[in-house]
């Protein structure tokens, strides 16, 4: 996120901002293709572990993590 803020201050073009925003998605997709499973940083409400994406579990706060 710090890289995004610094680029925005420097007057980054739309292409640079799109690349910065999409990098996280690309990294997660690549890890899934490699078989490495990590819980994405997406707020998803849950009641049981099955409500969450692969690699996540339902936490006591009612969200996947």
UniProtKB/Swiss-Prot annotation:
Localization, UniProt: Secreted
Keywords annotated in UniProt: Disulfide bond, Knottin, Protease inhibitor, Secreted, Serine protease inhibitor, Signal
GO cellular component: extracellular region
Key word Isomerase present: no
Keyword field contains Manganese: no
Cystine residue pairs: 39-56, 46-58, 52-64
GO molecular function, one term: serine-type endopeptidase inhibitor activity
Marked site: Reactive bond: 41-42
Principal cellular location given in the protein's record: secreted
Coiled-coil segments: none
Record Pfam families: Squash
Domain topic, free-text comment: The presence of a 'disulfide through disulfide knot' structurally defines this protein as a knottin.
Family (UniProt): Belongs to the protease inhibitor I7 (squash-type serine protease inhibitor) family.
Function: Inhibits trypsin.
Protein name per its UniProtKB record: Trypsin inhibitor 1
């Amino acid at each position: 996120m710090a890289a995004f803020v610094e680029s925005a201050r420097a007057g980054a073009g739309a292409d640079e901002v799109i690349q910065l925003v999409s990098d996280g998605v690309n990294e997660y997709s690549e890890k899934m293709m490699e078989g490495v499973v990590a819980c994405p940083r997406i707020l998803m409400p849950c009641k049981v572990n099955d409500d969450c994406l692969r690699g996540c579990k339902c936490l006591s706060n009612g969200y996947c993590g």
